[in-house]
């Protein structure tokens, strides 16, 4: 990539304006080539503090705006995304390495999120009124105030959008810090908000690394909406242990199980397992990390075909022809980290079936890997965010469920089975927020809640239930005329 093709940052977006940043240099690279893609600056402490002040200044007017008008701004945002659909999809692919077909799907999710969020708000946080003998019992909802959205790199447009849109609909103002790996995508999304006519200060974007995030979280804020690793989510939780008034919505991934039963259609099982483990180069929080297979001829045949499918899978840059199924992981550093994790599993007794390896130096391009952990000693309960599957064998279905539940996480779990009774048993005993039957573990719908239990979250599911953490309920007993009740309580004397 030549110097001329590097995207120069617009700056920090504060109070409806792009302001040239004064912080340390921040850069993002194309993970498929390792070349520089975008260059800008980390937000300074002063810029972050100023943005928070601006968000508070904009809050009263925005919160007092009618829901219908706030919804119109989100619809105008969608129209801007539609106009920039191709540019946004290409930028997602350039900055994350995703194949173009997957980036186009992400853009469609961004567009579809708005109407679903409007519907969810009207269903879950709409005012209600009940007449009683003494007064009107009213339920209404108010915004929390200024909320922080911390973006993730794997879906740089869609996941942040899933917090931002419900927050704005509820009347909050937003401080948005994208992932430091995907600042270019964030700038285009914010430009779409700007072009929608959204009032200044309602959304502000601050680019930066983890230090910027820490500074942002120390501000006068009323909510934090986060998608990312358990380690980071735990630090956020600990940071707010003395600030219980700040609402936290934490989505933190999982060590997700996929159980293969004695199925008839082995190829179907392989297909859904590929989509569960390898899609997005294994960088979805719902990806299956542990594949639990029967210790039988069916299990052997499944594993043989699964390994073959992984070998034949096309991997490459988003613009490669023929089109790849997956691209790279987010950068070279993460690729090396995943290879080190594979080495550690081998050292505790894991048996390599298909080694994960670096395909191109100084990039995030790695081949898919499969390791049999059945005889390993004390395997770590960690999420390896890569195209990497760990195999565990079982002798009876009860054992499969027991193995599936051997995790502190609880985001997604799946069963591939022709036996409905087995699914009912699986559903009854599995501890997870998303439980799928004969579908990939990565299959989710924005019309449903999205979140996990255990170390996967803090019981604040997003997607359709995001409205719940973007506003708080206010209960009121109301009577338009001040009167003395006909029957007074004993012991009270009035003149």
Curated annotation (Swiss-Prot):
Biological or metabolic pathway of the protein: Amino-acid degradation; L-arginine degradation via AST pathway; L-glutamate and succinate from L-arginine: step 4/5
Pfam families per record: Aldedh
Active site: 251, 285
EC class of the enzyme, as a word: oxidoreductase
Keywords attached to this entry: Arginine metabolism, NAD, Oxidoreductase
GO biological process, one term: arginine catabolic process to glutamate
GO MF term set: succinylglutamate-semialdehyde dehydrogenase activity
Catalytic reaction annotation: N-succinyl-L-glutamate 5-semialdehyde + NAD(+) + H2O = N-succinyl-L-glutamate + NADH + 2 H(+)
CDD domains xref list: ALDH_SGSD_AstD
Positions of NAD(+) binding: 228-233
Function in brief: Catalyzes the NAD-dependent reduction of succinylglutamate semialdehyde into succinylglutamate.
Classification via PANTHER family: ALDEHYDE DEHYDROGENASE-RELATED (PTHR11699)
This protein's name: N-succinylglutamate 5-semialdehyde dehydrogenase
Species name: Legionella pneumophila (strain Paris)
């Amino acid at each position: 990539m030549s110097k001329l093709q590097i995207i120069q940052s617009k700056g920090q977006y504060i109070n409806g304006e792009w302001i040239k940043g004064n912080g340390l240099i921040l850069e993002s690279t194309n993970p498929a080539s390792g070349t520089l893609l975008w260059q800008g600056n980390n937000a300074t402490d002063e810029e972050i503090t100023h943005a928070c002040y601006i968000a508070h200044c904009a809050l009263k007017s925005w919160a007092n705006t009618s829901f219908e008008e706030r919804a119109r701004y989100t619809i105008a945002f969608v129209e801007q995304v539609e106009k920039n659909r191709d540019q946004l999809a290409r930028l997602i692919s350039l900055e994350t390495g995703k194949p173009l077909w997957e980036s186009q799907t992400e853009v469609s999710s961004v567009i579809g999120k708005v109407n679903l969020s409007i519907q969810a708000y009207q269903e879950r946080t709409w005012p209600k009124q009940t007449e009683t003998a003494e007064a009107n019992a009213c339920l209404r909802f108010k915004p929390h105030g200024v909320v922080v959205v911390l973006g993730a790199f794997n879906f740089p447009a869609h996941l942040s959008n899933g917090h931002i849109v419900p927050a704005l609909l509820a009347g909050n103002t937003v401080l948005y810090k994208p992932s430091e790996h995907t600042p270019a995508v964030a700038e285009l999304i914010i430009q779409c908000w700007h072009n929608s006519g959204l009032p200044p200060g309602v959304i502000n974007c601050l680019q930066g690394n983890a230090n910027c995030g820490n500074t942002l979280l120390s501000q006068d804020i009323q909510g934090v909406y986060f998608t990312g690793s358990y380690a980071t989510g735990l630090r956020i939780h600990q940071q707010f242990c003395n600030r219980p008034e700040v609402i936290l919505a934490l989505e933190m991934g999982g060590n997700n199980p996929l159980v293969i039963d004695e199925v008839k259609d082995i190829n179907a099982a392989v297909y859904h397992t590929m989509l569960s483990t390898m899609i997005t180069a294994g960088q979805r929080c719902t990806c299956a990390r542990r594949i639990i297979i029967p210790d039988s001829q069916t299990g052997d045949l499944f594993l043989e075909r699964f390994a073959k499918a992984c070998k034949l899978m096309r991997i490459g840059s988003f613009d490669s022809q023929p089109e790849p199924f997956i691209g790279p992981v987010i950068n070279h550093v993460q690729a090396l980290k995943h290879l080190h994790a594979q080495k550690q599993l081998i050292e505790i007794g894991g048996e390599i079936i298909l080694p994960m390896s670096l395909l191109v130096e100084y990039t995030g391009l790695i081949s898919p890997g499969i390791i049999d952990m059945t005889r390993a000693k004390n395997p770590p309960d960690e999420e390896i965010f890569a195209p990497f599957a760990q195999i565990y064998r079982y002798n009876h279905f009860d054992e499969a469920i027991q193995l599936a539940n051997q995790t502190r996480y609880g985001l997604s779990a799946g069963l591939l089975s022709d036996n409905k009774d087995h699914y009912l048993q699986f559903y009854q005993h599995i501890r997870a927020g998303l439980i799928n039957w004969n579908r990939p573990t990565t299959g989710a719908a924005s019309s449903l809640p999205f979140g996990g239990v255990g170390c996967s979250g803090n019981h604040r599911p997003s997607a359709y239930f995001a409205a719940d953490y973007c506003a708080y309920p206010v209960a009121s007993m109301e009577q338009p005329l001040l009167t003395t009740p006909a029957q007074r309580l004993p012991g009270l004397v009035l003149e």
